[in-house]
Amino acid sequence: MERDKQIKTVGVIGHFAEGLDMADGQVVKTRTVRELLRDVCGNENVRFVDTRGWQKHPAALLHKCIELAKFSDALVMLPAHNGVKVFAPLLVFLRKRYGCKAVYSVIGGWLAEFIADKPRLAKKLRSFDAILVESNRVRSLLLEQGFDNVLVAYNYKRLPLLESFELEQPSGEPWPLAVFSRIYEEKGIDDIVWAVREANSRLGRRAFKLDIYGNVLPEYKEHFDVLMAGCDASEVAYKGVAPAGESTSVLNGYLVLAFPTRCPGEGVPGTVVDAYCAGIPVIASRWPSYAEMVEEGETGVTYEFYNRDALLDVLLNPELPKQLLAMKEPCLHKGRDYSYEAGLREFKHLVESGFNAHNQ
């Protein structure tokens, strides 16, 4: 079977949540990959299947995927943890039956650990033409597991990159901090709320103010409501969900983005990309792939994973505001690595190479 044919038509299988105003990382990346492929291949040459709620209609989903495979020179899937166990075998079957290439664009940085004790799933994924991961760390871990089809493609975002003259400078205390992500326990929300309040208490003044943006997950809402009820709104405030595509304008003017994640499966977090594109540095926990994204002292300040006392120490550093204000230009420069334009160049190369991981 010919495997190096030119790629003209592409099918994308993922959680698009069509018709819904959703801004979580999975949906945003899935939609962005579709748009990148449309711009590279032409709108008429890219079709998709939305997997939202597929468990209720598995037969209908299978039929749609078969029709998509008949149309496509390459199928690109973007499932999360549970979905990969279903869609990886499906794409292997469709690849064999219809001759289309199979590509897995991974969301986040969890895949290597997830499949370490799943040899059957790993075998399926090794037969893919390409697996696109967000970091060199994940690529290295997969290479150690015997994969030879892994490429690095960042989590690109379609955002306006601010120019230097557009950057708004915070004027002083209380220094404004922002959280900009889905709101649930593993994002470290409790840690940053505690750290801001504790820092202000120890300093004896309102040195920091925290604004929280994002969709509160249902399982965390009751806890979050209690957490917010115990805060003074002038110190910690929930600002709701920011309009899609307006993250840079919302973040412009903040001193720093707080990213206190407790999730080891982070890859290239979209919220950090948002911050860089707005010229905003980050205070981040050291998730496993952090060093590929956060340059210590250049684009952010990091602290020990899971250690909220270390987060507090960061805030109590009297030089922190001065250090962060000096990072704005490097952050803008770093943001270009994750821009839509950078993504176009990468996906154009991937398509022209036939998603051949061995010719990169």
Q: Model-derived features: where do they sit?
A:
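Donor nucleotide-sugar binding/catalytic pocket of nucleotide-sugar-dependent glycosyltransferases
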Residues: S127-S164
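Acidic donor-binding loop of glycosyltransferase active sites
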Residues: N252-E266, I280
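A charged, aromatic-enriched C-terminal amphipathic alpha-helix characteristic of glycosyltransferases
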Residues: K322-S353
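Conserved acidic donor-binding segment of nucleotide-sugar-dependent glycosyltransferases
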Residues: E296-G297, V301-R308, L315-K322
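Conserved donor-binding/catalytic core segment of Leloir-type glycosyltransferases
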Residues: K8-I13, E168-K187, I192-E198, L210-D211
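Short hydrophobic beta-strand element within catalytic cores of glycosyltransferases
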Residues: A258, C277, P281-A284, V294
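Nucleotide-activated donor-binding/catalytic signature segment of Leloir-type glycosyltransferases, i.e.
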Residues: E222-P243
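Glycosyltransferase donor-sugar binding loop
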Residues: D50, K209-H223
